[in-house]
């Protein structure tokens, strides 16, 4: 999954030996390799020569592939990447959750290049590499990749990487600028790019003038972060319209560079559409959206349901969700609560009332407490459980764990599951699953 071929060494007697992970090798290939780490039960190695290439091998278009840690699978045909991710999902469901989906959904996929609308790039002056570097970390390293372009960033962002290096190198505080975050908003027709610069010392007036000139030249918006996340502010221009659109539902979603939003806007639109179709919301339904964030799912659901309750652990995101609901004229059909869903209990869920449908979209840690609370409710108050749950996941292992609880303890059936290729050319596996309450 991380661009490594997996095999077994043979013992002297011909029996299967320890596992070997070969970076740069693909399934079915015959390669010459060199081990760089040996453990009692496994080895790690790199490819020296490909003797018999896989028919699925392609030439990576990025000159930094293999060094840069931003991508791991550019050498594998995109369709095969999705197939491998699907297999990872199914294997996790089987071996971790002890469950299997009745139906495997058609995968969600889209553009494989220029899709990364959010990114955090490190900044460092490295004299041995010619000066200022701006880029992703090298693979399994704290070093920064010496990169002048990036295939997965939007072309307009990729084009400014070298000028950005030159800009930072010209600042009086160039050694006190550790990172820049990229956030691109996308409406129906236009894009807006914001760069959030982390500064550990104040800018001089000359520095500020340089940032403004860069913004005018590249048509970007500067945000600055002098200390913690709470100190982030729009520097230039001060009025910024940063948003993404969900046109199918007539939703316009404003956000800040520090807000969590999906990296891939095109895939997010498809994901929201499919999730709502799978949720099968009726006009009379009361729906819960757990880990709701800015309201990415909450607001589209509100266009279909009678009422939606969004629950989020971040106070800042809860406030932003309230603002977004009001801006889209949906504040009368939505309600938001700030709760720690990693410690939620059956009593907490019971206090929220009965929901006909539930959408769960947790971070990588998953929704174990929510799943356990639903399992506890099923023992004595099964009538309070939602008939259908749609679970959107960014970690197949925690989805599998929670699926095991929902199926084996809470009385649900895993009806469908499939992958969402939110991060092409990487090992990240996003997925979606549908659970129906058994009668």
Regions from the PLM with identified roles:
Residues 1-60, 64, 332-335, 341:
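Terminal RNA-binding accessory module
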Residues 105-112, 180-185, 227-232, 418-423:
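Short, solvent-exposed loop/turn elements at beta->coil junctions and helix N-caps
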Residues 48-60, 66-177:
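Extended interfacial segments that mediate partner engagement and assembly in macromolecular machines
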Residues 113-117, 189-191, 427-428:
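A short, glycine/Asx- and small/polar-enriched loop/turn
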Residues 200-439:
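Rossmann-like S-adenosyl-L-methionine
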Residues 6-11, 135-138, 321:
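Short, acidic/hydrophobic/Gly-rich beta-strand patch recurrent on exposed beta strands
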């Amino acid at each position: 999954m991380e661009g490594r071929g997996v095999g077994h060494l043979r013992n002297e007697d011909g029996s299967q030996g320890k596992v070997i992970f070969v970076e740069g090798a693909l399934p079915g290939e015959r390669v010459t390799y060199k081990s760089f780490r040996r453990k009692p039960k496994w080895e790690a190695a790199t490819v020296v020569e490909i003797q018999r290439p896989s028919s699925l091998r392609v030439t990576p278009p990025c000159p930094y592939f293999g060094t840069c840690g931003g991508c791991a699978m550019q050498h594998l045909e995109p369709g095969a990447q999705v197939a491998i991710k699907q297999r990872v999902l199914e294997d996790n469901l089987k071996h971790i959750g002890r469950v299997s989906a009745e139906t495997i959904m058609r995968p969600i996929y889209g553009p494989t290049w220029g899709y990364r609308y959010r990114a955090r790039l490190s900044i460092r002056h490295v004299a041995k590499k010619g000066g200022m570097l701006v880029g992703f970390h090298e693979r399994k390293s704290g070093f920064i990749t010496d990169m002048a372009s990036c295939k997965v960033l939007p072309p307009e962002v990729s084009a400014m990487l070298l000028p950005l290096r030159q800009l930072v190198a010209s600042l009086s505080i160039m050694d006190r600028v550790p990172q820049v975050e990229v956030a691109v908003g996308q409406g129906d027709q236009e894009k807006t790019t914001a760069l959030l610069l982390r500064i550990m010392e104040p800018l001089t007036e000359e520095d500020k003038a340089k940032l403004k000139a860069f913004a005018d030249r590249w048509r970007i918006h500067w945000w600055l972060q002098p200390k913690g996340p709470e100190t982030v502010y729009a520097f230039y221009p001060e009025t910024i319209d940063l948003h993404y659109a969900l046109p199918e539902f007539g939703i316009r979603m404003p956000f800040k560079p520090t807000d969590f939003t999906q990296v891939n806007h095109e895939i997010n639109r498809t994901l929201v559409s499919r999730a709502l179709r799978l949720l099968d919301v009726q006009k009379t339904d009361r729906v819960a959206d757990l880990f709701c964030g800015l309201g990415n799912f909450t607001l589209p659901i509100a266009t279909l349901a009678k009422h939606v309750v969004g629950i989020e652990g971040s106070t800042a995101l809860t406030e932003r969700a309230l603002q977004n609901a009001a801006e889209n004229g949906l504040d009368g059909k939505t309600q938001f609560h700030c709760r720690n869903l990693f410690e939620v209990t059956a009593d907490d869920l019971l206090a929220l009332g009965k929901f006909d449908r539930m959408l769960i979209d947790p971070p990588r840690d998953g929704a174990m407490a929510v799943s356990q609370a639903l399992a506890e409710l099923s023992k004595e108050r099964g009538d309070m459980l939602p008939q259908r749950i749609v679970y959107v996941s960014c970690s197949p292992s925690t989805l599998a764990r929670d699926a095991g609880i929902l199926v084996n303890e809470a009385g649900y059936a895993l009806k469908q599951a499939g992958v969402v290729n939110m991060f092409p050319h990487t090992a990240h596996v996003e997925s979606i699953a549908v659970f129906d309450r058994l009668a």
